[in-house]
Amino acid sequence: MNRILRLRERLFGLASWDASRISDEWFRAHFEYAADVVNHWVGGVLDIPSSRFLNFGCGDGITDLSLVLRYGATSIHGVDVRQEYRKLPRIAREQLGMQRIPVALTFQTIKSGDALARAGRQYDGIMSWSTFEHVRRDQLATILADLHACLRPGGYLFIQIEPLFFSPYGSHLRRYDDTPWHHLLASEEDLWRVIESHEGALDPAEVDFGFADFGVDGYKRFVFNEYKALNRLTADELVEFAKNAGFSVAREERRFLDMPVPDSLAGQYPKEWLLNNEIFLLLRKNAV
């Protein structure tokens, strides 16, 4: 079947699409902003149309779709522990009027800690968008070493994390609780009460395509459990884990928020942790 689809696409080209149809803000953010950032960081060191990519933590695959449609990517394999990517054909129809997904995209469900290098595939580039804060801390070293093994010599891994745990909204719960550093100031029980009692509409850019699967109350519980499972990784720790896995840092950018730090936190945590909201990290596997 895949061979037939490839032949069809070769003969007739990609299915038509129209970005002016986009109505969902989550889709827009990942189709436009996230893809633009990946292209900015990865496109400067790799030729996107001729490179083979792995997306570690691909989610719903929207960013991958954009990289194909807007930046000419021809081979992206997305992996994730969830199966949100199965919704991509429907999402693409609704948001772009697109009748079929490009054959450049393939997806796979994995389990946490699966050794991807065993498949024997070598990639020119790997990307990971807001995923590594969700990786179990005791698996970080193993997973980064595995991703290193998945890259060809001279290949690149791009990692983005936002928000980092100790930053003002590092709980990933801002859609329900806009109090800066509340996760560091309140007990887990008090924090859950705030989430549980929340009423009203959410920021559309924070409502992903999995929301309907859970319902209002179920989604609250889902994101709160995700919060409890965060690995509390700092930017310095991420860089150290990556270096220990064999990567060299090709480029790095850390973004900070300009906010007054509560006195009660200033003595507990380094100021850099508390204000460092985001990291962009481009890593290289040295050539043989």
Language-model segments: which ranges?
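Short alpha-helix
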Residues: 229-246
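Core SAM-dependent methyltransferase catalytic element
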Residues: 245-247, 266-288
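Class I SAM-dependent methyltransferase SAM/SAH-binding core
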Residues: 62-115
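A short acidic, Gly/Pro-enriched loop at the edge of an enzyme's catalytic core
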Residues: 116-126
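Class I SAM-dependent methyltransferase Rossmann-like catalytic core
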Residues: 6-45
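Conserved class I S-adenosyl-L-methionine
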Residues: 50-59, 158-201
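A short glycine-rich, Lys/Arg-flanked "PGG" loop and its adjoining helix->strand segment in the class I
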Residues: 141-153
